[in-house]
Curated annotation (Swiss-Prot):
The lineage of its organism: Bacteria, Pseudomonadati, Bdellovibrionota, Bdellovibrionia, Bdellovibrionales. InterPro entries: DNA_pol3_alpha_NTPase_dom, DNA_pol3_finger, DnaE2, DnaE2/DnaE/PolC, DNAPol_HHH, NA-bd_OB-fold, PHP_dom, Pol/His_phosphatase_N. It comes from Bdellovibrio bacteriovorus (strain ATCC 15356 / DSM 50701 / NCIMB 9529 / HD100). It comes from the Bacteria. One of its GO terms (biological process) is DNA replication. This is Error-prone DNA polymerase. It is an enzyme of class 2 (transferase). The gene is dnaE2.
Length: 1061
C-alpha cells in the first residue's frame, strides 16, 4: 500500500506508540564538500555520522568526480571509528560513486559493482571533463551507454516513461529510482512519479535522504555555499536555496518512521548494496615497464646499472661495506618489485643529463646507496652512515618516495619529456586541493551577507596577517555595520567555510605514471595550465592507496649554479661542476662563519645568519648540522641553544645515558638533531627494528598533524628504555626530544643533500662574487632577497656593477671583460614591465647590425612602442645617447605616432628627436634623490648609489639637531658594531626581509639594509601589534630601540617603528 502524503519532519512531535524500525539501511546518495559548493560536510563527517547512526553502509557520490572517496575510505579504516557507539556495525559497507549531470539536464548516479565497473566510471568521468571547460562536465547518455557494464545506475528525478524506458534498456535490472521525503511539494511529486513507474514497469525503488550535509546544523552553511555558487546574496537567493534542513543524515529510527508505510524501500538499500563488491583496495598499480636490453630482466638490468654506477662512484674500488649495502638494498627492491620505479627515474635523470639540466635527488632517497650509484642522489650514505630504512623497508608498507629537484628554469623540459614518452593516457600530475583560507572565507561569506565591497576590503585589511583572530571579538561588529548577533553568525559561518575545498590545482611536481591506462585507475581532468592534466586525487590520497608517484620538483639554486658554471667556463676559463669544486676551502668557511651569506642556499635567512657565528661551521658535516638545526623540530624539542652552548664551550667529556647511544650521538655532541638519530636511538635502547623505528617516525608525524599524543608508543618506548637501564629522568628527556621531532624533525640525508648546494653556492660567492651575483640575478625570482640587495652585497664584496646601456646590455646580466678587469653589467630583464620578446629584439638587432648610432636609429631598428621606449629611458638605458634623462623622456613623450611611423618606414632617413616648439632650451639635470626614485620605480634599485647614502646627509643633520636637544641620534649599521648592549639608538634603512615564524611566539624580525650593510631588528609582540601596519606597508623604516649583543651578533630591540620621511 502506498502512502503519498508528506510525513512530518524528524524534529516534529513523534507518536508515543512503538515505532516501526527497518532491519537495515544504506545511504546510497551521500554527497560531501568535494562536490565543490554543493555539499556542506566533509567526507570524514559524512562517513563518521553514518557509522554513528548505525547504518549498514554509505555511498559517497560527489558531483562529476571521485575527489573525496579516498578520504571517506581512510575514515573507514580507522579502528577507533567502530568503538564510538554500541550501535556501530563493524561490517559497515563503504561504496563509492559519482553523480553525473548529462547534456539533457538530467542526472544519474553511477556506482561501480566491481573492478570493471570502477574502470568504466573513471573513463566516463574523464571523458566528461575533457569535453567541457575546466570545472565542468559534459556527457550524454549515449556516451555512458558504451561503458555501462559493471555499473549500478541510480536515476535521479524527475522521471517520465520515455526516460525510464531508455535507461532500462541500457542498465536492465541495474537501474534503481531513489525516493526521499523532505517536507517539500517537489519531493511529494517525485514520490508520485516513482510509485507510478513501480506500478507500471515494476521499477526498483529505494529510500534515500538525498543528504547534502551530515547534520541539520549545516543548513546555514549550505545556504552560504549555494549563494556563492550562484553569485548572489542571501537576501536575493530566493528559490535557489533549499527550503529546510531535512536534506541531512538521519537516525535509522527517524528514517523508519518517515517511511513506515514502505519499510521495504528502506531495506531495499541493503539489497542494492550487496550487489557491490568493489573496494578501493582492489586498485592495483603497475609501474610502466622499462626499456630493457635484450635478454635482461628488470632485476638484472637494475643490478647492472647499480654496479656500473658504483664503479664510477668508487673509482678506487667499491668498499666492502658499500658492496654489502648494495646487495641488501637490491634484494629488498627485488622482493618488493620496485625495479621499474627506479629504472623509470633513472631514465628521466639520464634525459636531464643529456640536456645538461642540473638535477639532484634529496629527502630520504639520499639514504640509499643504490640511488647514489644510479646517479639519482649525490650523497654517499655509506660514508655518512645514513639509515636506509628511513627510505625503504618491509615494515613501511608504502612505496619509496624519491624527490628530484631540477633547475627551476628548465623543469618544463623534463615535464614535456615525460608527457611525450608516456602520453596523457599513462601520465598525469597529482592535484592539490585549493581550499578556502581565512581571507577568502571572510570575503565570500561577507559577499553572501550583502556587505559593500569597501567594508569587505576594510575587514580584510583589519585582519592583517593574524587570520580571523582579530574578527572574533564581537566589539568590532559595529565597525563593519553589523549587530553583535548577526556578526556572531557571520563569523561562525566563515569559520565553517574555512578549509573547505574550492577547486583543484596542480601539485608542485608529483606525477603518476602507469603501465595500464591511468584513466582506468582514477579520473583525469584538465588543469588550468594549458597541456596539463591532473588526476582527481592529491598526494595524501595517492600515498594512502600506496600508488607510486615521482616528484619532478624545481629548485632555483640549481638554475643559479648551472648558470654560474657556464659563466666560469665561458668567461673565466674554469671548468667546475658540483662534483669538482674544491672541498674544505678555508676562505669559504671563514666567510660562512662571518655570516656573509646573502644569496647563498639555505643559510641566508635571518635565523641562520644569527646562528652561523655561534656555530662556526668548519667542515661539510658542520653545514649538515647547521641546515637541520634551525627547523621547528629541534627548536620545539629545545635542542638548539643547548647544542650551540656545547659547540662554543665543548666539555672534556660528554655523558651518555647508555653506551649504545654514543656512536649515534657523538657527531652532534650528545644531542639528537636528525630524524635518523632518533630512529637509531630506539633501535639501540628500546629494542625496535629499523623498520619499526621508521613506523615510529610516521606515528610521530601523524600525532603532530592531529595534535594528538602517541599513547601506547610512549609506554613501549619507556619499557624498552627501562630494560636497558636508562633512568626515568633521562627517558623523559628522550621522549620529549622524540615528540619535538614529530613531523618537523629534519632527515640527515635531506640536510646533507642541501649542504652540497650550500657549500657550492658559498664557494662561488667567496671566490667568484661577480659570477655568483650574475647567476643569482639571472635565476630570479628565487631566494630571500630582492635584486637590489644582491647587487648591493656584490658591490660591498668588490664587484664593479655597470649600469644599463642598450649598447652593451643583453637580456640577462653579463660578465663584461675590460682593461681594468671584469665587471657585472646589468641586464635589460631588470626593467619592470617589458616582455622578454621585445627585449630580445634590442639584443638581436645590435648583434646583427652593430651598435646603434643614436636614439633615432634605435627607434628605427627596434620598432618598439613608445611605452617601452619610455620604460627604457626611465631605467637609464639610453644614457649613452644623452646623459640628461629628463630631456630624453621629454623627447620621447613628445614623439607623435606619425613621427614614430616615419622612423619605422625610413631606415636611412636622418631624423632629429625633440623638435617640438614647446621644448625648453635645456632641462636641468635631476637631483640624486630624483634619479634614485626614477631608477627604483623602473627596476627596483640603482647601481650608482644606495638610497640611504643619499638620505644619510639629511639624517646626519637631523642627528645633530637631536643631540642638541639631548635626543637619541641616528646610527648606521657600521656604527652599531661599536655600540654597547642597551645603548639607545635610532636606525633607518630599506626593508630587506620581514619574518614572523610560527615558532617565534608572536615575535617579528626585520632586516634593514643601509649603504654599509644590514641591521637586525627584533620586534616583540606588543610592538608588532601596535605598528604592524607600518611594518607591512612601508619600504623605508625608522626604528627607535636599544642595542642587544649576543656574541658577534648585534640586534636592535625595537621600541617604536615609524615610516622614514
Amino acid at each position: 500500500m502506498t502512502n503519498k502524503a508528506l510525513i512530518p519532519s524528524q524534529n516534529s512531535r513523534l507518536p508515543a506508540k512503538p515505532r516501526p524500525r527497518a532491519k537495515g539501511f544504506v545511504e546510497l546518495l551521500g554527497r560531501s564538500n568535494f562536490s565543490f559548493l554543493q555539499g556542506a560536510s566533509s567526507p570524514e563527517e559524512m562517513v563518521s555520522q553514518a557509522v554513528e547512526f548505525g547504518y549498514d553502509g554509505m555511498a559517497l557520490c560527489d558531483l562529476n568526480g571521485l575527489y573525496g572517496v579516498v578520504r571517506g575510505f581512510q575514515t573507514i579504516q580507522s579502528p577507533s571509528l567502530f568503538t564510538a557507539s554500541p550501535q556501530v556495525k563493524e561490517n559497515f559497507h563503504y561504496l563509492i560513486g559519482s553523480e553525473l549531470t548529462l547534456t539533457d539536464e538530467s542526472s544519474v548516479v553511477l556506482i561501480p559493482m566491481n573492478k570493471q565497473g570502477y574502470s568504466h566510471l573513471c573513463e566516463i568521468l574523464t571523458l566528461g571533463k575533457r569535453q567541457a571547460a575546466k570545472g565542468f562536465s559534459k556527457l550524454s547518455l549515449e556516451q555512458i551507454e558504451k561503458y555501462n557494464q559493471g555499473l549500478l545506475c541510480l536515476a535521479l528525478p524527475p522521471w517520465t516513461d520515455e526516460r525510464y524506458e531508455k535507461l532500462e534498456k541500457i542498465f536492465d535490472n541495474r537501474l534503481y529510482l531513489p525516493l526521499w521525503r523532505d517536507l517539500t511539494w517537489e519531493s511529494q511529486e517525485f514520490c508520485r512519479q516513482g510509485f507510478a513507474l513501480e506500478e507500471k514497469y515494476k521499477a526498483q525503488l529505494f529510500v534515500t535522504q538525498r543528504p547534502f550535509m551530515h547534520s541539520p546544523e549545516r543548513k546555514p552553511l549550505f545556504d552560504v555555499l549555494t549563494c556563492t555558487l550562484h553569485h548572489t546574496t542571501l537576501a536575493e537567493a530566493k528559490n535557489k536555496l533549499i527550503q529546510n534542513s531535512e536534506r541531512c543524515l538521519k537516525s535509522l529510527e527517524d528514517i523508519s518512521w518517515l517511511w513506515q508505510d514502505r519499510l521495504d524501500l528502506v531495506e531495499k538499500t541493503v539489497e542494492i548494496s550487496a550487489r557491490v563488491t568493489f573496494s578501493l583496495n582492489e586498485i592495483r598499480y603497475r609501474y610502466p615497464a622499462s626499456s630493457l636490453p635484450s635478454g635482461m630482466t628488470p632485476t638484472e638490468y637494475m643490478r647492472h646499472l647499480t654496479l656500473k654506477g658504483a664503479e664510477s662512484r668508487y673509482p678506487e674500488g667499491i668498499p666492502d661495506k658499500a658492496l654489502k649495502q648494495i646487495e641488501h638494498e637490491l634484494e629488498l627492491i627485488k622482493d618488493l618489485q620496485y625495479e621499474d620505479y627506479f629504472l623509470t627515474l633513472k631514465e628521466i635523470c639520464d634525459f636531464a643529463s643529456e640536456r645538461k639540466i642540473l638535477y639532484q635527488g634529496r629527502g630520504s632517497a639520499a639514504n640509499s646507496v643504490v640511488c647514489f650509484c644510479l646517479g639519482l642522489t649525490a650523497i654517499d650514505p655509506v660514508k655518512m652512515d645514513l639509515l636506509f630504512e628511513r627510505f625503504l623497508s618491509r615494515e613501511r608498507r608504502e612505496p619509496p618516495d624519491i624527490d628530484i629537484d631540477f633547475e627551476h628554469s628548465r623543469r618544463e623540459e623534463v615535464i614535456q619529456h615525460i608527457y611525450e614518452k608516456y602520453n596523457e593516457r599513462h601520465a598525469a600530475m597529482v592535484c592539490t586541493v585549493i581550499r578556502y583560507r581565512s581571507r577568502m572565507a571572510i570575503r565570500e561569506t561577507a559577499k553572501v551577507f550583502g556587505m559593500p565591497l569597501a567594508k569587505i576590503n576594510a575587514m580584510i585589511k583589519f585582519m592583517g596577517r593574524d587570520g580571523m583572530k582579530r574578527l572574533l571579538d564581537p566589539a568590532v561588529a559595529a565597525d563593519f555595520g553589523m549587530e553583535p548577533g548577526p556578526w556572531k553568525m557571520f563569523m561562525a559561518l566563515a569559520q565553517q567555510l574555512h578549509g573547505f575545498p574550492r577547486h583543484l590545482g596542480i601539485h608542485t611536481g608529483g606525477f603518476l605514471i602507469t603501465q595500464d591506462p591511468i584513466t582506468e585507475m582514477v579520473p583525469v581532468e584538465k588543469a588550468t595550465m594549458n597541456g596539463r592534466y591532473v588526476i582527481q586525487w592529491n598526494k595524501d590520497d595517492v600515498d594512502f592507496l600506496r600508488l607510486m608517484k615521482i616528484d619532478v620538483l624545481s629548485l632555483g639554486m640549481l638554475t643559479c649554479l648551472r648558470k654560474c658554471f657556464d659563466l666560469l667556463r665561458d668567461v673565466k676559463g674554469r671548468d667546475y661542476s658540483l662534483a669538482t669544486l674544491p672541498a674544505d676551502d678555508k676562505p669559504t668557511y671563514d666567510m660562512i662563519c662571518r655570516a656573509e651569506t646573502v644569496g647563498v642556499f639555505q643559510i641566508e635567512s635571518r635565523a641562520q645568519m644569527n646562528t652561523l657565528p655561534r656555530m662556526q661551521p668548519r667542515n661539510f658535516y658542520d653545514l649538515v648540522i647547521e641546515i637541520a638545526l634551525i627547523r621547528p623540530g629541534p627548536l620545539q624539542g629545545g635542542m638548539v641553544h643547548p647544542f650551540l652552548k656545547l659547540r662554543q664551550n665543548p666539555p672534556k667529556e660528554i655523558k651518555y645515558a647508555h653506551p649504545a647511544l654514543e656512536p649515534i650521538l657523538k657527531k652532534t655532541m650528545g644531542i639528537p638533531i636528525f630524524q635518523e638519530q632518533v630512529m637509531k636511538m630506539v633501535v639501540a635502547v628500546a629494542d625496535f627494528t629499523p623498520g619499526e623505528a621508521d613506523e615510529l617516525r610516521r606515528v610521530m608525524s601523524s600525532a603532530w598533524k592531529r595534535k594528538a599524543t602517541m599513547g601506547g608508543i610512549e609506554q613501549r618506548l619507556r619499557t624498552g628504555f627501562a630494560r636497558h637501564g636508562i633512568s626515568s629522568e633521562y627517558a623523559d628527556q628522550i621522549f620529549k626530544t622524540i615528540e619535538g621531532f614529530a613531523n618537523y624533525g629534519f632527515p640527515e640525508s635531506h640536510s646533507a643533500s642541501f649542504a652540497l648546494l650550500t657549500y657550492a653556492s658559498c664557494y662561488l660567492k667567496c671566490h667568484y662574487p661577480d659570477v655568483f651575483a650574475c647567476g643569482l640575478l639571472n635565476s630570479q625570482p628565487m631566494g630571500f632577497y630582492a635584486p637590489r640587495t644582491i647587487i648591493a652585497e656584490a658591490q660591498r664584496n668588490g664587484v664593479v656593477v655597470a649600469p644599463l646601456d642598450v649598447q652593451k646590455s643583453d637580456y640577462d646580466y653579463t660578465i663584461e671583460k675590460t682593461a681594468a678587469g671584469d665587471l657585472l653589467r646589468v641586464g635589460l630583464r631588470s626593467i619592470y614591465g617589458i616582455p622578454e620578446v621585445l627585449i630580445r629584439r634590442i639584443e638581436d638587432s645590435r648583434k646583427e647590425e652593430g651598435l646603434y648610432i643614436d636614439l633615432a636609429d634605435f627607434i628605427r631598428r627596434t620598432q618598439l612602442p613608445r611605452s617601452v621606449l619610455l620604460k627604457l629611458a626611465a631605467a637609464g638605458a639610453f644614457e649613452s645617447f644623452n646623459s640628461n634623462v629628463r630631456e630624453l623622456i621629454w623627447n620621447l613623450e613628445s614623439l607623435s605616432l606619425d613621427q614614430q611611423s616615419f622612423l619605422w618606414g625610413h631606415p636611412k632617413e636622418q631624423f632629429e628627436l625633440g623638435e617640438d616648439d614647446d621644448e625648453p632650451e635645456h632641462l636641468p639635470f635631476e637631483s640624486n634623490w630624483d634619479r634614485l626614485r626614477r631608477e627604483y620605480d623602473s627596476k627596483g634599485y640603482s647601481v650608482e648609489s644606495h638610497p640611504m647614502s643619499v638620505l644619510r646627509t639629511y639624517l646626519h643633520s637631523k642627528s645633530e639637531a637631536l643631540r642638541e636637544k639631548r635626543f637619541v641620534p641616528y646610527f648606521s649599521s657600521e656604527d652599531l658594531k661599536r655600540m654597547k648592549t642597551k645603548t639607545k639608538v635610532r636606525v633607518a634603512g630599506l626593508v630587506a626581509i620581514t619574518q614572523r615564524p610560527p615558532t617565534a611566539k608572536g615575535m617579528c624580525f626585520i632586516t634593514l639594509e643601509d649603504e654599509f650593510g644590514f641591521v637586525n631588528i627584533v620586534i616583540h609582540p606588543e610592538i608588532y601589534q601596535k605598528d604592524r601596519t607600518t611594518i607591512y606597508t612601508r619600504s623605508l623604516l625608522e626604528i627607535h630601540g636599544q642595542v642587544e649583543k649576543v656574541g658577534a651578533i648585534t640586534n636592535i630591540r625595537a621600541e617604536r617603528i615609524l615610516p622614514l620621511g
